[in-house]
């Protein structure tokens, strides 16, 4: 009887924690570094073209960035769909009883497809996910590692050949810890240490989840342009942003290049820099010299990081 009461009490505690959005205590320990490194020891074979992509996230994906990826991909792409929200967590995209803030507004376009339905369909060669900002709150309250694991497992169950990607974003420019400082620290301590390594520690997770290191690319570009000002239209970090957190068209172009390079395992150097937004209007194009710098930096960064799956230079 006592054991039964303990089991009931534990179950009740877990329900209360979930209802309050508080962290659970049963999260797996991060996959040890030797096993984690082994998953990425060999570059992944290139997926055959054309590739169909599905995006899950929020306004740091938005409508325009996937449209830019599709234009950069050209005949290598086979279309894309998405489910978005305002600051939406992966948990809200998975759980039917957890609301996705801004759902009606963000998904009022022809590229919308329900997230659970999409990954279960087996229709996609690449599934790209990101987590809400602030990443520390997502880890603490939204069980990010678990929902990354759930979406990845569902994707592979429907299409064993599909690739799963985790898109590293950033935090507000005004972050008191320092914008560049946090990008340097957060990749290891949060994106990989608390999310990817815990997701891959779940039972049955024997395949890598690949990283789209947009934050690292942005930090590298910002360091270069702020150390050597004078590039037309790109002199400091604010030239990539429309506000404290969201990107302007130049910033979106940089992130789209990063997605292209990782998913296609191909250099973005020489790609077009004058693209359209999702609504068909011309995006504000970077200066050709700035675009060439972006393309070079993207390729150097993704080649230098084994978690991207891209072969090293």
Cite the ranges covered by each PLM segment.
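Bacterial N-terminal signal peptides that target proteins for export
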Residues: 2-11
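Bacterial Sec-dependent signal peptides at the C-terminal "C-region" and cleavage site
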Residues: 16-32
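Alpha-helical cap/lid subdomain in secreted, periplasmic
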Residues: 113-249, 261
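Serine-esterase "nucleophile elbow" of acetyl-processing enzymes
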Residues: 29-88
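Conserved SGNH/GDSL esterase-like catalytic core that processes O-acyl groups on lipids
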Residues: 63-145
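Acidic/histidine-rich, surface-exposed loop or edge segments in extracytoplasmic proteins
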Residues: 47-55, 125-136, 280
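Structured segments of extracytoplasmic/periplasmic soluble domains
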Residues: 59, 63, 68-76, 130, ...
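Conserved catalytic region of serine esterases and O-acyltransferases that act on ester linkages
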Residues: 26-27, 236-313
């Amino acid at each position: 009887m006592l054991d039964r009461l303990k089991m009931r009490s534990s179950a009740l505690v877990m329900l209360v924690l979930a209802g309050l959005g508080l962290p659970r205590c049963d999260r797996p320990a991060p996959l040890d570094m030797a096993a984690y490194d082994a998953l990425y020891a060999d570059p992944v074979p290139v997926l055959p073209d054309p590739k169909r992509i599905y995006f899950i996230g929020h306004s740091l994906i938005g409508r325009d960035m996937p449209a830019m990826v599709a234009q950069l991909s050209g005949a290598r792409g086979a279309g894309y769909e998405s489910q978005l929200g305002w600051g939406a967590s992966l948990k809200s995209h998975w759980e039917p009883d957890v609301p996705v803030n801004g759902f009606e507004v963000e998904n009022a376009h022809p590229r919308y497809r329900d997230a659970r339905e999409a990954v279960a369909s087996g229709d996609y060669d690449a599934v790209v996910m990101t987590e809400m900002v602030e990443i520390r709150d997502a880890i603490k309250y939204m069980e990010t590692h678990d929902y990354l694991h759930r979406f990845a497992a569902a994707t592979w169950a429907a299409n064993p050949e599909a690739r799963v990607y985790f898109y590293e974003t950033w935090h507000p420019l005004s972050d008191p810890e320092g914008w560049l400082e946090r990008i340097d620290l957060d990749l290891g301590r949060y994106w990989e240490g608390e999310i990817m390594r815990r997701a891959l520690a779940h039972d049955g997770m024997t395949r890598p989840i690949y990283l789209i290191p947009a934050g690292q690319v942005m930090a590298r570009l910002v360091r270069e342009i702020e150390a050597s000002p004078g590039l037309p239209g790109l002199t400091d970090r604010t030239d990539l942003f429309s506000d404290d957190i969201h990107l302007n068209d130049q910033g979106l172009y940089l992130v789209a290049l990063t997605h292209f390079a990782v998913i296609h395992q191909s250099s973005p150097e020489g790609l077009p820099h004058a693209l359209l937004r999702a609504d068909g209007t011309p995006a504000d194009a970077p200066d050709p010299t700035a675009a060439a710098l972006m393309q070079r930096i993207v390729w150097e960064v993704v080649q230098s990081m084994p978690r991207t799956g891209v072969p090293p230079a």
